[in-house]
């Protein structure tokens, strides 16, 4: 069994057995997955590069949300630039021609992106919750410095979680076929450590963040529903936006997390069936595509839905240089949020989109 010989997934070479050596080796995988990887690469580089340029050149990272979104775009960029390597790797029937160093770098970039993306999306949901539900109480804490320190902590924790890829990920050459794979190669004595890391990926990398994101946006929806109780159409818009955020996160990541857990069961010999091996090895690259398609959608959802971001984006494509003006800090804006939420003028300016607006003002 070639257990999860694909981008960013666990592979215990010592447990490869001859009777399952063809699991996951299907021609449609070698054709379809590289095409999808290439598509994600093009769209991801384009979308995330625009986010970086707009925030850095026009918005100057003056709010917590803009700092989080900038780091989210940079994290996604670090990942998507490795996709051509994985596309070639898959197209060559899981043969890695790029050497040991790129194997480690590309694999680490994937794990790093997984944790930074999830943690940053969680921080964005908490920031939106604080700004909308507790604008006055959160004013002191919601500063750019706090956001930057939070991002430093996120990158540090994500790197520590990626250390198994740095240490164990390497090329391995099968002597009978001369096939070179990029895999996690470790002794059988380390299996429980690797299983533990996979479970951490399930719990810390998905379940806990999902609960926080779901709770944050549920409370946001409840607050805005009370504010706009008399405006049914507005409530529907807000509700749809919040549901889109939660469902996008859930459906992009849950398939990959389920297959990661199945892989844990395989590593622990709980599952010892070649048919199930084939299902996991075949499905894993597909779930990877679904999960990391999120890297394409993030900038559009969290950036282009914002009114001010769209304005600066249009300036960029029209080659209009950024205006030399001081952007109002979120600290000077938050004191009037409570009044704005009840103001009819702000209601007419699509407050539903304010959930995603990283400059946080309604004019």
Curated annotation (Swiss-Prot):
Subcellular location as annotated: Cell membrane
Extracellular-facing ranges: 1-27, 92-100, 168-192, 269-278
Cytoplasmic side: 58-63, 128-143, 219-239, 305-363
This protein's record includes keyword RNA-binding: no
One annotated GO biological process: neutrophil chemotaxis
Cross-referenced PROSITE patterns: G_PROTEIN_RECEP_F1_1 (PS00237), G_PROTEIN_RECEP_F1_2 (PS50262)
Tissue expression from the record: Heart membranes, follicular oocytes.
Molecular functions per Gene Ontology: angiotensin receptor activity; angiotensin type II receptor activity; C-C chemokine binding; C-C chemokine receptor activity
Entry function: Receptor for angiotensin II, a vasoconstricting peptide, which acts as a key regulator of blood pressure and sodium retention by the kidney. The activated receptor in turn couples to G-alpha proteins G(q) (GNAQ, GNA11, GNA14 or GNA15) and thus activates phospholipase C and increases the cytosolic Ca(2+) concentrations, which in turn triggers cellular responses such as stimulation of protein kinase C.
Binding site for angiotensin II: 169, 186, 201
Protein name: Type-1 angiotensin II receptor B
